[in-house]
Amino acid sequence: MKIAYVFKSNMASTFQLGTMILPQLEDNSHLVNVVGMFFFDDNIMCLQKGNPVGERLAKIAKEKKMHLMVCDQCAVRRELAEGTFEQCGSGEVKAKGLVDGVVAGCFPQLYSALGPNAPDPVSYTHLTLPTICSV
């Protein structure tokens, strides 16, 4: 099964990603093909250059061809992107200060990026945080 994660809830990247999902990806026990991850709000902070979780994730993402994206508005607010709020959603905002392979964007850019490798549909009645999305 192919899935994409959306990290939206408070500390999802610290707790669910850092202590559960990432270790499973590293030891190949996650049992699904994660094709992408999308980060909102303070969850993007784990992707700053030098952050141990972000550096580990960047390595896995490169190996597994996983798409990593941060919300462009969230990144602009935290000075982790070059661009303006008016450019958000257009694909013009560029991530900065983040681990290798991370891009900034909004849902239109996420859908375009994952389109060729789209996740499988998932039942939204069984969601846990971080959200498993079918995009």
PLM feature segments, named:
Residues V34-N43:
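A short beta-strand-loop structural module common to alpha/beta enzyme folds
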Residues H30-V35, M66:
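A generic structural motif
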Residues I3-G18, N43-G50:
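Short, glycine-rich nucleotide/cofactor-binding loops
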Residues L57-V99:
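Mid-chain, well-packed structural core segment of small domains
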Residues T125-T131:
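Conserved small/polar residues in nucleotide/adenosyl-binding loops
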Residues G97, G105-A113, N117:
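A short aromatic-anchored loop/beta-hairpin motif
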Residues T14-H30:
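Histidine-anchored nucleotide/phosphate-binding helix
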Residues T19-I21, N51-R56:
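Charged helix-capping and loop-helix junction motifs
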